[in-house]
Design a protein with these regions (language model features):
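Bacterial signal peptide processing site
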Residues: 18-20
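Acidic, polar low-complexity linker/tail segments
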Residues: 34-112, 118-126
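Von Willebrand factor
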Residues: 104-169, 176-222, 227-231, 253-260
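Short solvent-exposed coil/turn linkers within tandem alpha-helical repeat scaffolds
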Residues: 209, 228-229, 428-437, 509-522, ...
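VWA/integrin I-like adhesion module and closely mimicked acidic/polar interface patches used
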Residues: 225-310
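C-terminal "exit" segments of structured domains
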Residues: 271-414, 420-423, 427-434
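Short coil/linker segments at helix-helix boundaries
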Residues: 393-400, 455-511, 516, 533-536
Length: 536
């Protein structure tokens, strides 16, 4: 629905500005050109001596495996260097063969497949069934890896949507029975996904069987979403550790900093929840939701390269993996922009418990401010502001200026709700040591300052014209407000805000090259952060 909101905003902006104003998009000449990939990727840093790792650092380093298990593809950067997030579901099912082999080599193993039965997961589910059929047919024909007897691997299948359904409830070692049930999952049209409740039920049901039979327990979650109840993840991790289970997930990458991508949902819901909940990749979003002046609809989505936080955190806390998959026809991730794995491995999400995450926020005002700013609603861009004012009649000119100023007045509180906490927390910026948090805070403040400078500057420049401004050429009768790299005429306060935006955005480009944060900083800088009057 965001594209509808953006369209309505453009219509509202055109209202109430009087006959003295002519409309055009003053930002149109700054529309971004298609960017080519840089000729070279950043030089690889020299390996540092291995430090003594904390438990948190060990967990995060383990998480980075999420990109190492992915296949080839083309990145925006690196001249087509192969990157991940391009493996098929079937390929990721096949990758689990190695995990199964390692497990049954250690001890007899029970594997429980937890499969998303919702409508949006139809392609994922079909691809999983194809991959699993190939896997189990091979087990049936050629035996288990390492020559292990068939009873060393038992299988159960569970599906979930709004409710949980046990497709193969009693674990079976009959591979033919498993093959026969792969396509037996019924589609759930509710759009609801009780993912973590189902995982908890599986632990409760199969944990005791694991103990009774002396088996290892592997759980594989196959889903295209994050789960409506993903916030249960900390309690589920505790239950997983007490059960002694290794969790894997096969799914799509999370949209960076977003609960859902700006694509048409494949299903609908009536309970107020997003139709498709697929992110973010961090526990909470660390990306402010501000539209770009220079961007089109749906142009802000980025493939994070990581799975949604809850499932990824669960998988790696149990020594499993989240296997990122790309689907052939699903709208997400589709052709969304993605970045080189070698770069993104340096920016893993913070895999912390809820308590640990909140402690980090309480210790640093900049992080707390980022958290607050990223939780605000979307701030629309001032895409088509009035820019040309004909001076024919003072009363009509005043009406036109009043109407134009109402646009800025409407946006101002939304912008301040993002900018003000970030500016207040700036004093703690240099205390941030995590690279992802550094880049996220800098981008948030840089973008918020840029938007504030443009909107407040626009309002102030209109106020200056309203107060009276003489033409240098007496034959001229029109003032045109054009984008410029200055706000000196609007006042020192706004010029300071403009310079603050420029400083933060340029720092991101310098310190975090070839990353999504640098890309968004470049995109923000494509439009000048300021205004000037030109007479005609």
């Amino acid at each position: 629905m965001r594209w509808i909101s953006a369209t309505l905003m453009g219509v509202v902006m055109l209202a109430g500005c009087g006959e003295n104003v002519k409309f055009r998009n003053p930002l149109a000449k700054n529309q971004p050109k298609q960017q080519a990939a840089p000729a070279q990727t950043a030089a690889k840093p020299k390996a540092d001596p291995k430090p003594v790792q904390t438990k948190e650092a060990q967990a995060r380093n383990t998480m980075i495996r999420t990109t190492s298990l992915r296949g080839g593809g083309a990145s925006r950067f690196g001249n087509g260097k192969t990157v991940g997030a391009n493996s098929s579901v079937e390929e990721n099912v096949e990758r689990l063969r190695t995990e199964i082999a390692g497990s049954i080599d250690f001890a007899p193993t029970m594997i429980v497949w937890i499969v998303d039965s919702t409508l949006s997961a139809s392609e994922l589910r079909s691809s999983w069934a194809n991959g699993a059929k190939k896997l189990y047919t091979d087990f049936q024909t050629n035996g288990l890896p390492g020559g292990k007897p068939a009873d060393n691997l038992s299988t159960a299948i569970v599906s979930f949507g709004e409710k949980t359904d046990f497709v193969i409830e009693q674990p079976t070692t009959n591979f033919g029975e498993v093959i026969g049930k792969l396509a037996a999952i019924q589609t759930d049209n509710s759009g609801k996904e009780s993912t973590f409740a189902t995982i908890g039920q599986v632990f409760d049901k199969y944990g005791p069987i694991k103990q009774q039979q002396g088996r290892e327990l592997m759980v594989v979650v196959v889903t295209d979403e994050a789960g409506d109840d993903w916030k249960q993840v900390d309690s589920i991790v505790e239950k997983a550790n007490s059960t002694g289970v290794r969790v894997y997930a096969i799914g799509v990458p999370a949209p960076m900093g977003r609960m859902m991508a700006e694509v048409a949902p494949q299903e609908s819901r009536s309970d107020g929840m997003p139709a498709m909940l697929q992110g973010p990749e961090t526990r909470y979003s660390q990306r402010v939701d501000m539209k770009f002046n220079s961007g089109g609809f749906g142009g802000d989505d980025v493939d994070s390269g990581y799975g949604p936080f809850g499932l990824t955190y669960l998988a790696y806390q149990t020594r499993g993996s989240f296997l990122v998959s790309r689907l052939r026809s699903a709208p997400w991730p589709g052709s969304a922009m993605r970045f080189d794995d070698e770069v993104m491995r340096k920016y893993p999400p913070q895999y912390l418990t809820e308590a640990q995450y909140q402690a980090k926020l309480s210790e640093n005002k900049a992080l707390a401010a980022l958290h607050q700013a990223a939780s605000q609603g979307q701030v629309e861009a001032m895409t088509y502001p009035a820019s040309q004012f004909v001076v024919e009649d003072e009363a009509r000119l005043k009406n036109a200026l009043d109407g134009a100023q109402r646009i800025a007045a409407r946006l101002e509180p939304m912008i301040n709700a993002v900018y003000d906490p970030l500016a207040e927390g700036e004093k703690d910026r240099d205390k941030i040591t995590d690279k992802r948090w550094q880049a996220s805070y800098d981008l948030a403040l840089g973008r918020a300052a840029a938007v504030k400078a443009r909107v407040d500057g626009y309002n102030q420049m209109l106020a200056i014209l309203k107060g009276g401004r003489k033409f240098e050429d007496p034959s001229h009768d029109t003032w045109n407000l054009e984008p410029a790299d200055t706000l000196e005429e609007a006042g020192s306060r706004l010029e300071k805000t403009r310079l603050q935006a420029k400083e933060y955005l340029e720092r991101i480009i310098k310190e975090h090259p070839d990353t999504p944060w640098a890309y968004f900083a470049e995109k923000e800088l494509e439009t000048p952060i300021g205004w000037k009057w030109v007479e005609y």
